Design a protein with these regions (language model features):
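Glycine-rich phosphate-binding/hydrolytic loop that grips phosphoryl groups
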Residues: 48, 60-77, 223-227, 279-316
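Nucleotide/phosphate-binding catalytic cleft detector across ATP-hydrolyzing
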Residues: 1-8, 13-87, 214-221, 319-358
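Phosphate/ATP-binding catalytic cores across multiple sugar-kinase/actin-like superfamilies
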Residues: 1, 70-73, 223-245
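Short glycine/threonine-rich loop-to-helix capping motif typified by GTGT followed
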Residues: 14-27, 242, 254-274, 315-324, ...
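Short glycine-rich phosphate-binding loop at a beta-alpha junction
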Residues: 2-13, 164, 245-254
């Protein structure tokens, strides 16, 4: 019974908190970009017209776009207390990043797009029963698994990343993401779409007898989202005077990060070409952080420290952001020297295909 609870902790982005408090949310993303509050503090259940007898604490935001959900998420990691540099990346439709150590912290945020959560393509769906969640390609053959082991209804974010990564490794698409119809019979021109598509589930494989496919346009839209995520990371590293190699550990938050294949995410160029041991995935860091604070009030000191010491940057105001994004609209990147492991895999798969055709 919530009415008997003494305290509730809420962590959310600045816009959602404004909605909950019935404040003007337009102030968050309209000039002069000054939210009504970034630190609501405590409210009673009665003030919010909730059937709750205790106090409700809202975790404060760092800026308009780096909200209390990110501050809460940082409670689940500890790089802001260490000498080594760490990086926290909450990635979904929006991307929020924090980089630093015990001496300095820099945050940034921007729109990534819906592709990483499956919300592109005619057959892109959220993670649910019947969603294709993993894809493997061997030569011309494609294999997949679905959530719940059901016949496929569509493909979710983790499946899309696998699909694009595997197509790149096996020559179904080139570095620009252009489909290659000579690579497999599953890559074909579809009259009703007016373009080439990659069929990942034939009609006899799907739940309703409809072939499921990813179009050339879908790939382009995906690369826009992927490029935004990569460019935000790239710009934040430059703002901090760091390279990807300088980061001792990457903390990845969000459903996509918890369920997606890290190697595929590196292959398509979302994340830098690093050893998997340098990455930790956290499913719901905002919820975990709120729980941590609820069970240990001493962590309020961390909340105060983070909101006072994190410097926020604006990616959109960086003069070369658009140029960097264009360079990132490749698989994995226009500069393959930054992705030696991916290049090695591409070469190995190509050699395997050539041996099988001799």
């Amino acid at each position: 019974d919530m009415r008997g609870c003494p305290v509730m902790v809420i962590s959310g982005n600045t816009t959602m908190v404004h909605f909950l408090l019935e404040l003007d949310a337009w102030t968050v993303f309209s000039a002069p970009y000054a939210p009504v509050t970034s630190n609501p503090g405590f409210y009673s259940g009665k003030e919010l017209e909730m059937d709750f007898g205790g106090q409700i604490y809202f975790i404060p935001a760092i800026s308009n776009y780096v909200g209390g959900d990110i501050v809460s998420g940082l409670l689940t990691v500890d790089f802001y207390k260490k000498e080594e540099i760490g990086l926290f990346f909450d990635i979904g439709t929006n991307g929020e990043l924090v980089i630093g150590n015990k001496d300095w912290l820099i945050a940034g945020a921007g729109a990534a797009g819906p592709a990483l959560e499956g919300d592109i393509s005619k057959y892109g769906i959220r993670a649910c029963d019947g969603a294709i969640d993993t894809v493997k390609i061997y030569g011309q053959d494609l294999f997949f698994t679905t959530i719940g082991n059901k016949k496929p209804k569509g493909i979710c974010g983790s499946g899309i990343i696998d699909l694009i990564a595997e197509m790149r490794l096996n020559g179904w698409v080139d570095i620009s993401g252009t489909l290659n119809p000579e690579a497999s019979g599953r890559v074909r021109y579809l009259e009703e779409e007016g373009q080439y598509v990659a069929v990942y589930a034939e009609a006899e494989e799907s739940w309703d007898g409809t072939p499921l496919y990813f179009t050339q346009t879908d790939i382009s839209q995906y690369l826009d989202t992927k490029a935004a995520a990569h460019t935000m990371l790239d710009c934040l590293l430059e703002s901090a005077g760091c390279t990807a190699q300088d980061i001792s550990h990457y903390y990845l938050s969000g459903a996509f990060c918890a369920h997606g294949n890290l190697e595929s995410a590196i292959t398509v160029g979302i994340f830098p070409d690093m050893s998997p041991e340098r990455f930790t995935a956290i499913r719901n860091s905002s919820l975990d952080g709120a729980r941590t604070l609820l069970l240990n009030r001493n962590r309020m000191e961390d909340i105060e420290y983070l909101t006072e010491h994190v410097y926020s940057v604006q990616f959109a105001s960086m003069p070369d952001f658009t140029i960097r994004m264009q360079a990132s609209k490749f698989i994995p990147h226009t500069n393959m020297e930054d992705y030696p492991t991916v290049q090695k895999k591409i070469d190995e798969r190509k050699n395997t295909r050539e041996r099988h055709t001799i």
